[in-house]
Design a protein with these regions (language model features):
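Short intrinsically disordered, low-complexity coil segments enriched in acidic
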Residues: 1, 19, 106-110
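Bacterial N-terminal signal peptides that target proteins for export
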Residues: 1-10
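Bacterial N-terminal signal peptides
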Residues: 9-18
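Sec/Tat signal peptide C-region and signal peptidase I cleavage site
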Residues: 19-25
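N-terminal segment of the mature folded domain
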Residues: 25-110
């Protein structure tokens, strides 16, 4: 379990490193997505906040589809920085991201 937590924390750190410059204007990372992944993501976010110089990310449980929809709406401080999903992104969701300027998408499987 400790290895899994360490890997997840590392994955979150990598995701944070990839956050766009406009999102860095905000002092908190915003994460939306899967209600299934939410309890696990909450623990990871809290540990990240305790063990780094960054504030604990703000999490919102929206469901996988809802999170991907919000994430793909655009780039900037008014949009989520990261989305969690209990499934792979659909091609239609990927295409929606691309058409809204969300071009740098990295999947991290846990």
């Amino acid at each position: 379990m400790k290895l899994k937590t360490a890997l997840t924390t590392a994955a979150l750190a990598v995701s944070i490193a990839a956050v766009s410059a406009p999102a860095m204007a905000r002092d908190t990372i915003n994460i939306v997505g899967s209600s299934t992944v939410y309890p696990f993501a909450t623990v990871v976010a809290e540990r990240f906040g305790r063990n780094t110089d960054f504030p604990t990310p703000k999490l919102e449980s929206t469901g996988s589809g809802g999170g991907l929809k919000l994430f793909c709406e655009g780039v900037g401080t008014q949009y989520p920085d990261i989305t969690n999903s209990s499934r792979r992104m659909k091609k239609s969701e990927f295409d929606n991201c691309q058409s809204n300027g969300v071009e740098s998408i990295t999947e991290v499987r846990i």
